[in-house]
A protein has these predicted regions:
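Bacterial N-terminal signal peptides that target proteins for export
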Residues: 3-28
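C-terminal motif of bacterial Sec signal peptides marking the signal peptidase cleavage site
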Residues: 36-39
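Bacterial signal peptide processing site
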Residues: 41-43
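Alpha-helical cap/lid subdomain in secreted, periplasmic
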Residues: 119-261
Length: 261
């Protein structure tokens, strides 16, 4: 600004002999210099006063929020008789972390839960985000001899509620089998129920959650019902065999099969 002022003062010493038109040209040129100087000065101040402007702002990319996998089940999911870190959903989380997948596992297992009890508490569970939902209920119904039609109705209600609240969520149904204590027909109908539900709802199915564990004393606790530490590892493998397909479909990438401990 001092430079511009000096230029204007210098006009006083311009000889009066200059033609009026020439003096006008000089005055116009100096005016343009003045306007440009003021504009640049204001821009400098604006950049200084606005540290959040594009010129000064550092772009920081925040990590994407993790997707949620909910395991909704009974004592097998809850890890009855095991340390918390030995339950199969925790083993699934470890597998996911080893592959650097952006998912977190929520263990919503409750010991002794029936399909009716699950249907009663599902609304509370659905208050949190759900991207993948694994339904593991029905075993306690079978042990109590609850009619298969009633169990199926409750499981269908749970599936309907999940789909209604989170239509983009992917569901996985864990199949279960029961010994023929209640009769062979009951055992057959019970086993078929899971296949029917999976087909009717177009969802993934784990044919038998306890494959390789059920009836094997080596992999069960003393009660002969709940998996021990080694049994839980096998259950995790059974679950991962289906879950990885769901995640592969969502992420369109390859996964290594199996577990390593």
């Amino acid at each position: 600004m001092k430079i511009v002022s000096s230029i204007f003062n210098g006009l006083k010493f311009i000889t009066p002999a200059l033609h009026i038109r020439d003096r006008f040209k000089i005055t116009l040129s100096i005016s343009l210099i003045f306007i440009t100087a003021v504009s640049c000065n204001n821009n400098d101040k604006t950049a200084t006063k606005q540290p959040g402007s594009v010129a000064n702002k550092e772009t920081k990319s925040s990590p994407a929020a993790k997707k949620t996998i909910v395991f909704f089940g009974n004592s097998i999911t809850a890890g009855y008789g095991l340390e918390p870190e030995q339950a199969f959903p925790v083993l699934i989380q470890q597998k996911i972390d080893s592959l650097q997948l952006n998912y977190k596992v929520v263990n919503a297992g409750v010991s002794g839960e029936t399909s009716s009890g699950g249907n009663s508490r599902i609304d509370w569970i659905l208050k949190q985000p759900v991207d993948v939902f694994i339904l593991e209920l029905g075993a306690n119904d079978g042990l109590r001899g609850i009619p298969v039609s009633e169990t199926k109705r409750n499981l269908q209600a749970i599936i309907d509620k999940v789909k209604a609240k989170y239509p983009d969520a992917q569901l996985v149904l864990a199949g279960m089998q029961v010994p023929p204590n209640m009769g062979q027909k009951y055992a057959t109908d019970f086993r078929s129920m899971f296949t029917e539900l999976a087909k009717q709802n177009n969802i993934a199915l784990i044919p038998f959650l306890l494959e390789g564990v059920g009836g094997e004393a080596t992999f069960n606790q003393q009660d002969g019902i709940h998996p021990n530490v080694e049994g839980a590892k096998i259950v995790a493998e059974n679950v991962w065999a289906q879950l990885q397909r769901v995640l592969r479909g969502r992420l369109k990438r390859n996964f290594e099969d199996g577990f390593s401990y």
